[in-house]
């Protein structure tokens, strides 16, 4: 059997984490352990997590002294899995709950050819609509969730996708030995797409299974910090582009991304979020010169697939919510 470490991050969210863990310990697939990574909580999380650790043999606790974000917390769990010889590691949001067959279905997905990441059907907590079926990366330089907001009965068939959702996906541990861990510059948001992009460039595939079902209370952690999502978005979108887009696609995607970036920046200013947006942009410039540009050289020099292949698996369209960009789309595609 495939041995799996399920990694759950907690940051001042113990009530959600307790519900999450209750759903995980009752999985029908039994060759797993759970590692709860506490990301510097200042509430009563640690006290309650230590009690849970004593109650369940399958649960262990790792403590980060400060909040290292999703990417840093995930890396704590991945390093733990690598050190102890697990075959796979699953990242699961603490504000989510899993169907009892969720893990079993993810493991089955590893049987698909050349698959190193398996992602499932993540629903909103009421189960009526879809949160994610993986992620797209578009020719406009913007990643976004597949099928978000669609009715659950419209969930797509299982098959290969561009990116898995970091909140409920399974990764072969051997993959991280090859492509490296999560990039902690991202901290949170789009770090999962970055790993998936690097996975695709390295010649591995990512599989979506609609039978691995989980339920997500979207944004329960990020809502605690005003401006957090805006800052991370404006910082991370350029990093994702700089590191991963092949040279032959830099110009066509870059022109579109510039237009889209300006539009969403103007929208952020209009909504009173101009300061975190501007700070995010400045941070992206700093990371470009100090880290992402140098990482690009390594990633692209080790690329095992063609530019045409990457072009074939990205989405040649805008995300559904980018209504303001439709007027520009006609310039590039000839359609409104």
Show which residues each predicted segment covers.
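Active-site-adjacent helix/loop segment of glycosyltransferases
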Residues: 7, 206-312
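Short, acidic, metal-binding catalytic loop of nucleotide-sugar glycosyltransferases
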Residues: 22-31
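A conserved acidic beta->alpha catalytic loop
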Residues: 23, 38-47, 66, 96
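Glycine-rich, basic loop-to-helix element that forms the pyrophosphate-binding segment
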Residues: 63-84
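Short beta-strand-to-loop acidic/aromatic patch adjacent to the donor-nucleotide binding site
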Residues: 86-97
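Conserved donor NDP-sugar-binding/catalytic core segment of glycosyltransferases
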Residues: 96-137
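A recurrent flexible, glycine/aromatic-enriched loop bordering the glycosyltransferase active site
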Residues: 129-130, 150-171, 188, 193, ...
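A short, conserved alpha-helix in the catalytic core of glycosyltransferases
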Residues: 162-213
């Amino acid at each position: 059997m495939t041995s799996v470490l399920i990694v759950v991050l907690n940051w001042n969210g113990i009530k959600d984490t307790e519900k999450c863990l209750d759903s995980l310990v009752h999985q029908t697939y039994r060759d797993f352990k759970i590692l709860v990574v506490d990301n510097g909580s200042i509430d009563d999380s640690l006290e309650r997590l230590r009690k849970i650790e004593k109650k369940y043999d399958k649960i262990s606790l790792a403590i980060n002294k400060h909040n290292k974000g999703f990417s840093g917390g995930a890396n704590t769990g991945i390093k733990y899995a690598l050190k102890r010889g697990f075959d796979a590691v699953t990242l699961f949001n603490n504000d989510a709950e899993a169907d009892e067959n969720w893990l079993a279905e993810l493991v089955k997905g590893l049987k698909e050819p050349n698959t190193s990441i398996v992602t499932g059907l993540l629903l909103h907590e009421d189960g009526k609509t879809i949160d994610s079926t993986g992620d797209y990366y578009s020719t406009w330089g913007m990643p976004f969730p597949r099928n978000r907001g669609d009715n659950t009965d419209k969930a797509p068939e299982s098959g290969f996708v561009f990116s898995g959702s970091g909140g409920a996906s399974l990764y072969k541990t051997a993959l991280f030995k090859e492509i490296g861990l999560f990039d902690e510059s991202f901290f949170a948001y789009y770090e999962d797409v970055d790993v998936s992009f690097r996975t695709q460039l390295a010649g591995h595939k990512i599989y979506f299974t609609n039978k691995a079902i989980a339920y997500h209370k979207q944004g329960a952690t990020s809502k605690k910090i005003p401006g957090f999502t805006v800052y991370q978005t404006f910082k991370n979108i350029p990093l994702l582009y700089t590191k991963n887009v092949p040279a032959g696609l830099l110009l066509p995607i870059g022109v579109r991304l510039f237009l889209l970036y300006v539009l969403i920046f103007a929208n952020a200013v209009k909504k009173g979020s101009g300061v975190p947006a501007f700070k995010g942009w400045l941070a992206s410039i700093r990371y470009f010169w100090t880290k992402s540009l140098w990482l690009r050289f390594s990633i692209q020099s080790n690329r095992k697939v063609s530019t045409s292949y990457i072009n074939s698996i990205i989405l040649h369209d805008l995300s559904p919510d980018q209504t303001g960009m439709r007027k520009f789309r006609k310039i590039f595609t000839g359609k409104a």
